[in-house]
Amino acid sequence: NIEKHLGGSLIRFYFKDEPYEIKNNEHFQLQLLLSLIQPKDSMTAGDSNSHQLLKLSKKVSEADVTVFINGPTGTGKEVLSRFIHKNSRRSEKPFVGINCAAIPENMLEAILFGHEKGSFTSAHKQKSGKFEQANGGTLFLDEIGDMPLDSQTRLLRVLSNKEFYRVGGDKPIKVDVRIIAATHQN
């Protein structure tokens, strides 16, 4: 069982914030991008560190676990998340990404969970959120560290219960989504 081998239900990647590492990460990003356009079984790495990361990422992709990627801006966190999705059993389902820092706080929950018609002033029709759009696939939450704490709490409930309510809704919506979260914060 790969999940037991990897030690649990959450896997964390960390990219160091050092000039040497950043320089190497440029090469790593290129290798990851190349691997995304190559056949599913191939992996490309130019050095042993990149090869080890790709090898671990491939194992992680086979386990249906939540993934947390931590590292500075520009180190390839989204590219790595796409690599994990592409090599997972969810690869034929949607990969949906959202930058949590770019969404106004008052709109974040409606974008993540959707909303019912009339739940707020401009809600003229029911709308599905990112969780529903990613159902069966992967939801990439970029800059999750910038998400307000109350939204993080609601997100934790979705991870625990595998269901949520749309804003203004009273019926739970079941969801099967793999979360890959990333941040530049420690």
For the regions a language model picked out, list residue spans one by one.
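Alpha-helical transmission elements in cytosolic ATPase-linked domains
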Residues: Q52, F83, I111, R154-R157, ...
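Conserved post-Walker A coupling segment in P-loop NTPases
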Residues: S42, K58-S122, E132-P148
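Dynamic helix-loop-helix/coil hinge segments at AAA+ ATPase domain boundaries and subdomain interfaces
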Residues: Q31-L54, N106
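Conserved Walker
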Residues: R89, S119-F131, I144, P148-S151, ...
